[in-house]
Amino acid sequence: MDWRSAFNFSERVLLSIPSKEVLNPLAVSKYNRKFGNGFSTATHFNDDKSAFAITIHHREGKNEKYKIYLFGTDLTQQLKYDFSDQIEEKNYAFENIATSKDLKTLYFMGKAFFKKRRFDAKERKYQYELVKITNAGHSTQKFADEGRFPESLKPILIDNKLISVGFYADRKDNRYNGLAYFEMNSNSLAIQSKKYNPFSKQFMDDKFGREVDAVVKNLIFKDIHITPNKDIVFSAEEYFVTKGEEFDGNGRRIIEKFHYNDIVCAKLSAQGDMKWARNINKTEVTKGDAAYASYSIFGHGEDMFLFINSGENPQKLSNERIMFKQGYSRNPNVFVIKIDEKGNLSHKKLIDDKEVRLPIMVSRPFVDKASDNLLFYAKRGTKKQMVRVNIGVAPSEPSK
């Protein structure tokens, strides 16, 4: 018997668009800022993974087309929208989504890059926009306060209350200065209140010690947790791509290196005031599969638990700071970092190479929130292992 029939798997064509063959149509990163005239697409899941949106930017003859689709995880199409008219003046690089519970409303957050407008030296060539889409049409809200430059914004629906959280910079060069909060009307998208919270001294000490004139850059939104009293805890990661040379038997070739560095975790009150912000020093670089790099995070009540691969022991830095270093190695050590409701940090080694002999895909666990379990997959070649971690008052020893 074929194993797929044993699980009752079936195939269904969701979308079909006439074009030249595209070898890897989902390979375009949602953070890619290059806009060509070819075929590009991106897929975005909502927070509880109950739905996913697909954007498709392509050409039909001489015309550029931009289509947006929303599907439930049962693969039923909930929305189909032609966004083509909006890309005549702007290119959109969407980053995050939120959906209504009935999946009839889609909120898309991202950068809108102006195509023809002229800019002075103090302006950026893009602005953040939130786009609300229903079958009846769309509406847009821009975030463009003078002297404030939002970054990595994320829309969230909390009991039908629409908010957006992220970071902001005082200059256009993406040197982040703090946390941004916007409360919005979920129907009109009008901004009802907003707050800009500068990074705290604690956060800057975490990241830089006593270094002066240091900067926070390249933060990409990662995850969000709503506490029982509706406080907002969100995390982001310092992520960027560099290019380098690699030599092999065929000569020199240019390769891309993907950097997953420091983790930022911050807590805002339900009204948008910052309670704390912490920085966790980390450095990782990979040339390929990101599953073994980065981190995963699990919110439990008022506490946050972060899981990362790291070397045998974190490196000690100045001012009682530590650095978690390159995680993907032949020694699969997994550390758990706990941040409590006051922002206090603690950590311990959760898994070492005596328990699990294969590298763990630490950034892609299966999360069962109903039972407070995380299931991690470990793999090298044809060898595989599974690791289960249970979250209670504190993480227990993993059972395999």
Go through the PLM ranges and name each one.
Residues 140-154, 191-218, 273-295, 330-335, ...:
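Conserved blade-ending motifs and adjacent loop-strand segments that build the rim/top face
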Residues 367-400:
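Blade-level signature of beta-propeller repeat domains, shared across WD40, Kelch, NHL, RCC1
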